[in-house]
């Protein structure tokens, strides 16, 4: 299966809600519409999860999507880094919890 932005939104919203994620941004090949069957899922999340709780979120995403995932918390991204630029250039918000 080649994942789309909509696929990611639908599949991951329950996971984000369960783990208390306040915002999730999809970036990389899926966000750009250039994904292949081998593409991983690249996500930036705004959460208060640390340590094993963050690992639990990553594992839940991996289980739901059955794909390799790269998940970064907003606190992991160095401002102005190449990754920060990529997220801002290609990122699409796929989840926002308005609590």
State each model region's role.
Residues 1-23, 32-37, 48-99:
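Catalytic core of pol beta-like nucleotidyltransferases
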């Amino acid at each position: 299966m080649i994942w789309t932005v909509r696929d990611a939104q639908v599949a991951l919203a329950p996971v984000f809600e369960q783990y208390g994620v306040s915002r999730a941004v999809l970036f990389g090949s899926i966000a750009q519409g250039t994904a292949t069957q081998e593409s991983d899922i690249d996500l930036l999340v705004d959460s208060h999860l640390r340590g094993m709780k963050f690992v639990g979120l990553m594992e839940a995403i991996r289980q739901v999507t059955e794909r390799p995932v790269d998940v970064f918390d907003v606190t992991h991204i160095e401002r102005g880094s190449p990754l920060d630029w990529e997220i801002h250039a290609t990122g699409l918000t796929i989840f926002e919890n308005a609590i």
